[in-house]
């Protein structure tokens, strides 16, 4: 499994934060271990979603604050908030390739409706998926 990171997410997080997030992401996707800070994992696919985002199968994971993780007994689907989302995509040809694109915060649901921002994210996903 290979996890790539955009320049954007590298600017949003410290090296230590990005390393920890990457380790959690690998553990989650490869081993099926749900970290305490990971919540609902879903494609952007509602009627307001930018078409390129849908086409490139861009997804997001709700993120809890490390100081206030999701309750362990709460089912993943119910682990939601409007604090932060990890935006990512999977390779189109290589299912073991993943791209961590950005952290949307604050108000990630509102940011996901920003066509300018989502178009940029869609272009990053498109470039990655054309290669992987």
Curated annotation (Swiss-Prot):
A matching Pfam family: YafO_toxin
Disulfide bridge partners, by residue number: none
Top-rank lineage group of the source organism: Bacteria
Key word Repeat present: no
Enzyme Commission number(s) of this protein: 3.1.-.-
GO cellular component terms listed in the entry, alphabetical order: toxin-antitoxin complex
Keyword check for Hydrolase: yes
InterPro entries tied to this protein: Toxin_YafO (IPR020353)
Keywords (A to Z) from UniProt: DNA damage, DNA repair, Endonuclease, Hydrolase, Nuclease, RNA-binding, SOS response, Stress response, Toxin-antitoxin system
Induction details: Induced by amino acid starvation, glucose starvation, the DNA cross-linker mitomycin C (SOS response) and when translation is blocked. Induction is decreased in the absence of the Lon protease suggesting, by homology to other toxin-antitoxin systems, that Lon may degrade the YafN antitoxin. Transcription is negatively regulated by the cognate locus, probably by YafN. A member of the dinB-yafNOP operon; it has 2 promoters, 1 upstream of dinB and 1 specific for yafN-yfaO.
GO biological process, one term: SOS response
A GO MF label: ribosomal large subunit binding
Assembly description: Probably forms a complex with the antitoxin YafN which inhibits the mRNA interferase activity.
Protein role: Toxic component of a type II toxin-antitoxin (TA) system. A translation-dependent mRNA interferase. Overexpression causes cessation of cell growth and inhibits cell proliferation via inhibition of translation; this blockage is overcome by subsequent expression of antitoxin YafN. Overexpression causes cleavage of a number of mRNAs in a ribosome-dependent fashion. YafO binding to the 50S ribosomal subunit in the translation complex induces mRNA cleavage 3' to the region protected by the ribosome; YafO alone is not able to digest mRNA.
Record's protein name: mRNA interferase toxin YafO
Native source organism of the sequence: Escherichia coli (strain K12)
Gene, per the UniProt record: yafO
């Amino acid at each position: 499994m290979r996890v790539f990171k955009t320049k954007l997410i590298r600017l949003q997080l410290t090296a230590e934060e990005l390393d920890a997030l990457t380790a959690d992401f690998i553990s989650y996707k490869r081993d099926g271990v749900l970290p305490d800070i990971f919540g609902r994992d879903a494609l952007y696919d509602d009627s307001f979603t930018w078409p390129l985002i849908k086409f490139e199968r861009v997804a997001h994971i709700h993120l809890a604050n490390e100081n206030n993780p999701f309750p362990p007994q709460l089912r993943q689907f119910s682990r939601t908030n409007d604090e932060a989302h990890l935006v990512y995509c999977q390779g189109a040809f290589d299912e073991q390739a993943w791209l961590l694109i950005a952290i949307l915060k604050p108000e990630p649901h509102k940011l996901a409706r920003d066509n300018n921002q989502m178009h940029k994210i869609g272009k990053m996903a498109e470039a990655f998926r054309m290669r992987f």
